Amino acid sequence: MSSVSGVRTPRERRSALRSLLRKRRQRELASKVASTVNGATSANNHGEPPSPADARPRLTLHDLHDIFREHPELELKYLNMMKMAITGKESICLPFNFHSHRQHTCLDISPYGNEQVSRIACTSCEDNRILPTASDAMVAFINQTSNIMKNRNFYYGFCKSSELLKLSTNQPPIFQIYYLLHAANHDIVPFMHAENGRLHMHVIFENSDVHIPCDCITQMLTAAREDYSVTLNIVRDHVVISVLCHAVSASSVKIDVTILQRKIDEMDIPNDVSESFERYKELIQELCQSSGNNLYEEATSSYAIRSPLTASPLHVVSTNGCGPSSSSQSTPPHLHPPSQATQPHHYSHHQSQSQQHHHRPQSPPPPLFLNSIRAP
């Protein structure tokens, strides 16, 4: 008991001393941990600067990036121990290679700027939203013959080309990346083309404001591995993600192309899909050329460009835009010459020779991506 004069008893003094020492040890321990990760955070600990005895080597920002790159789990622990969420954003340069993407950051693309935003500071992501993984996308790839209508937006990008569809069955990452992107952004238009026996994909976003969650990016890179380059760019005022194949790895998954092709042939193509390909015609041409396929002008000099979805020349399409006219039934689509106004000189030379021999000379078929571009 304390005396009347207010003097503490020995027991009270020992209790107060133990409490003081315990609080001091807690402050010292917190100061040591904070100064080890980032010396600047120690000044925020009760507003007291660290004492000289507690001084530790401070890590620079570059040191932290190197550590987090080698040990991603430490980055998560570092973010979890922070009491206040960081609000910093980092601008990115276009074209942006996804392999240079910082972990745990989302991508915000808009007319106001292109930035990487930390996941914990992102205001667009929903906490209760669960996105599919690369494994989920592989399961969907295996079961795609049973879910044609669910993934119909993906098959529109083949424009009913059996050659492109056959290539896709040997390249699961193309489907996986589309599947992951479509789960995060529904307003996308995929387009496929081939070069040197490899299938490539361009995904056009129809909105000017695009948000790609960090979980989606991580799973895309998991599916792409080192065989595909995934880049984001703005082409003709549209956000585009290009998936280019560098090497085709052997896949143990086998898809029945015959069943897949038959179901796709039976699928109706909506008019708005035809209109979207017509609207993005010049954009698609530029994307194909930028990815290394520069055969467009050479091929159009000798072949009529066919409509992507009806497989018929554009100049015999009916005026209502819903189908070919009656004249298209009398002549096979691949024998229609281009219009007189757009015929090049050497095409006229070939045409005169074909009239003399009563048949058109044999020439190699046009590139596969020409089946998906309409003539002006």
UniProtKB/Swiss-Prot annotation:
| Keywords annotated in UniProt | Host membrane, Host nucleus, Membrane, Metal-binding, Phosphoprotein, Zinc, Zinc-finger
Question: What GO biological process terms does the UniProt entry carry, in alphabetical order?
Answer: viral budding from nuclear membrane
Q: Where is this region: Disordered?
A: 22-57, 316-376
Q: Name one GO molecular function term.
A: zinc ion binding
Tell whether Membrane is among the UniProt keywords. yes
Pfam families recorded: Herpes_UL31 (PF02718)
How does it get modified after it is made? Phosphorylated at serine residues in the N-terminus. This phosphorylation regulates the localization within the inner nuclear membrane. Phosphorylation by viral kinase UL97 at Ser-19 plays an important role for correct viral nuclear egress complex (NEC) localization.
List zinc finger spans: CCCH-type: 106-211
Instruction: Report the locations given in the UniProt record.
Output: Host nucleus inner membrane
Q: Which GO terms describe its cellular component?
A: host cell nuclear inner membrane; membrane
Main location, first listed in the record? host cell
Q: Which residues carry this modification: Phosphoserine?
A: 19
Going by the entry's taxonomy, the superkingdom of the source organism is recorded as Viruses
Q: Where is the composition biased (Polar residues)?
A: 33-45, 317-332
Q: How does it assemble?
A: Forms a heterohexameric complex with NEC2. Interacts with capsid vertex specific component 2/CVC2; this interaction directs the capsid to the host inner nuclear membrane to initiate budding.
What is this protein for, i.e. what is its function?
Answer: Plays an essential role in virion nuclear egress, the first step of virion release from infected cell. Within the host nucleus, NEC1 interacts with the newly formed capsid through the vertexes and directs it to the inner nuclear membrane by associating with NEC2. Induces the budding of the capsid at the inner nuclear membrane as well as its envelopment into the perinuclear space.
Report the sequence similarity comment from the record: Belongs to the herpesviridae NEC1 protein family.
Which protein is depicted?
A: Nuclear egress protein 1
Protein's organism: Human cytomegalovirus (strain Merlin) (HHV-5)
Q: Which gene encodes it?
A: NEC1
